[in-house]
């Protein structure tokens, strides 16, 4: 049996309708999603990740300053372990390190990344290291929107937005698992108006793809994993050239073998597909597909990459599709999961 955990925004300020974390059982025979739990949590469990052994789930509480841990029970449901304060406001991303001893959190308005020790029982312990993202002036910050590992989990990419006072950038850190410390190796700064949001790392660890929220674009960068350096090589739009309206690019994702890159567009309510040249890393736009809903903040493949999902935050739907890597085409399976204000999906 496989499971899906859906983080749902909950607050009136976010115009949200969710109640917390939902657990679903997914039938291996039919693919049907069956809700088995709705765990009411602290506000806005807006992003979550499992530890490497998949025994525990960790969730950040958007717009607040807390991070929570949960035990995954034998029946797939969640039980509370603990919640800690990190100090930085609006944690937006969380990921385990390669040793499974730490969870790393990016806080947007906190302008920082926090390395948190995991206790033996799966609960969250103390913060052992904090990396602050400096802004343009003393006391200003750059807004950390994502912290994600390279494929070897030796380097941490921290994607930051400027929001007038900081820098739109990717800061690269080398990670020391002995003490959880981070040492900067590079800093790529994007165009002033782009507002970088998320990156995806190719399986070969040499190609990095950055989706830019305000620029509505995708940037390709090469990565040297011997010294932790980035170099920008290409930029393509995420919106069709016949579309003249507003847009807010959101998430990026690579297919299993790294041949297809996908980006999601809010307001335009679509995904864009690119084919990746496996020798050079350059992108070629393949086409656009509606997400059949409003505000596709989050996109994901399931565990074996056989199915693709777009979480439409403002229409309360998760839309299932299937990617053919050979042709680079998406097809709709017809399955739509209805859940309130979905903003993150974790498969187990």
Each predicted region: which residue ranges?
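Short loop/turn segments immediately following beta-strands, especially the blade-tip
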Residues: 24-31, 70-77, 115-125, 172-181, ...
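Residue-level detector of Asp-centered blade-edge/turn motifs that repeat once per structural unit
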Residues: 50-54, 96-100, 150-153, 203-205, ...
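Asp-box/WD-like beta-propeller blade repeats and closely related beta-sheet repeat scaffolds
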Residues: 78-150
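Loop/turn-rich, solvent-exposed surfaces of beta-rich toroidal or solenoidal domains
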Residues: 246-313
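Beta-rich catalytic cores
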Residues: 17, 44-46, 90, 143, ...
